[in-house]
């Protein structure tokens, strides 16, 4: 999902997939001089909040990380998401989401309130804010174009349905 977010323009480090002991792994480039998100920095929190819809689209339940360690703030103030392993059909530790991953986008609502930190950053987003987050990254056309970066056909199909659902909701 790194490539999908990158195609949208969401900050993610360069990444490469490789196999280790028969299991897929991802190696990401170190984000030099990036610092952890500080919830007291309202400007940084607002910039992360603007990235919500792309993360909800991919089902990145762990966008912020348990200790706010999955999002860093680069020296120029832009967020970078250094671990999107909890997105798509997989949970943060690699297990399948099963029926919790599908074409519907209840994540637009439920991801605003997943403990421990999402309510502090994403909580109570208005429909207008959701629409602005979607439009910030090019809206339906850009979200659909980015699907070409997803290798698995089933994931691509589900993502297409999720994008269509989001577009209907925030139109």
Segments predicted by a language model, with ranges:
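Conserved kinase catalytic-core segment
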Residues: 34, 40-94
């Amino acid at each position: 999902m790194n490539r999908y977010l990158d195609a949208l323009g969401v900050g993610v480090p360069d990444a490469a997939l490789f196999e280790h002991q028969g299991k897929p792994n991802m190696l990401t480039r170190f984000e030099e001089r990036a610092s952890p998100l500080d919830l007291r920095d309202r400007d940084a929190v607002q910039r992360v909040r603007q990235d919500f819809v792309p993360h909800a689209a991919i089902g990145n339940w762990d966008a912020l990380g348990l200790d706010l360690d999955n999002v860093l703030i680069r020296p120029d103030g832009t967020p970078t998401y250094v671990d999107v392993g909890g997105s798509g059909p997989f949970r943060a530790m690699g297990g399948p989401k099963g029926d919790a991953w599908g074409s519907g986008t209840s994540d637009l609502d439920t991801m605003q309130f997943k403990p421990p930190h999402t309510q502090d950053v994403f909580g109570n987003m208005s429909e207008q804010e959701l629409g602005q987050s979607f439009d910030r990254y090019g809206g339906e056309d850009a979200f659909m174009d980015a699907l070409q970066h997803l290798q698995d056909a089933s994931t691509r199909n589900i993502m297409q349905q999720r994008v269509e659902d989001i577009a209907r909701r925030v139109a």
